[in-house]
Amino acid sequence: MMDVAILVDENTRVIVQGITGFQGSFQAKRMLDYGTKVVGGVTPGKGGSEVHGIPVYNTVEEAVAETNADTSIIYVPARFATDAIFEAFDAGLRLVVCVTEGIPLYDEMLIHRKLREVKSMLLGPNCPGVISPGRSKVGLLPDRSFTQGNLGVVSRSGTLTYQICENLTKAGIGQSTVVGIGGDPMPGLTFVDVLKMFEEDEETKAVLLVGEIGGTAEEKAAEFIKQMSKPVVAFIAGRTAPPGKRMGHAGAIIEGSTGTAEAKMAALRDAGARVAETLLDVVKEVRRVLE
């Protein structure tokens, strides 16, 4: 476990798959500006060129060999994303972050099968990435929402994370690491995986879990929270969502009585987490556990 942050820190060496595309190029520049060590990019057929002074390679394998990268972020369209993820796994990268939305569920099942055979960790797909404020950002999280501190944040929602962290930052509560696991039904890293990392991380004093309706990820997290020594605050989005209607994320759908906000909030409360009723209550509850 790293001494200073989970998943990424100032020594993380990042390549951008799809760096010559609009999003890849734009976000590579923003990561560079933040201080992230973006050491290379990959676009088949564009090897030998440069983007913002970052060398571009034809394959991930070549990029890793030349740059000693340990992390990749993927900005490629959904129909190419599975191959891009597999290529990153095969190159032996420690962490693969996939921002791409709309990867078919069947492909995600193939990705999960492959994950069991490799040493890589996958964050996403359909996620905003990860930031250790003041150290490194791998993803598209807006810098100004975050400041360095000792609250670990893990979330299924992207924009909600930015809003909550901005509120925390304005209230003087900084974050150790903020992890967006993504809103798809089958994420790589899960709430439980990230909670384990925060539990072991010396810099993290408390954890905020931001969940949403649909699936059972929050209920599984609640089971793990029972054995955590660190205080956990939770917020669940989607309390007013109608059953049977997909809300924004593919994973955000209530089927029958499973996946409702009430069921998740009850499970988290029973596990000993402090559950914030509204967005505005999050700061109050976090402040309470950090005092």
Swiss-Prot record:
The active site is at H249 (tele-phosphohistidine intermediate). Its EC number is 6.2.1.5. GO terms for biological process: tricarboxylic acid cycle. GO terms for molecular function: nucleotide binding; succinate-CoA ligase (ADP-forming) activity; succinate-CoA ligase (GDP-forming) activity. SMART domains: CoA_binding. Substrate binds at Y162. This is Succinate--CoA ligase [ADP-forming] subunit alpha 1.
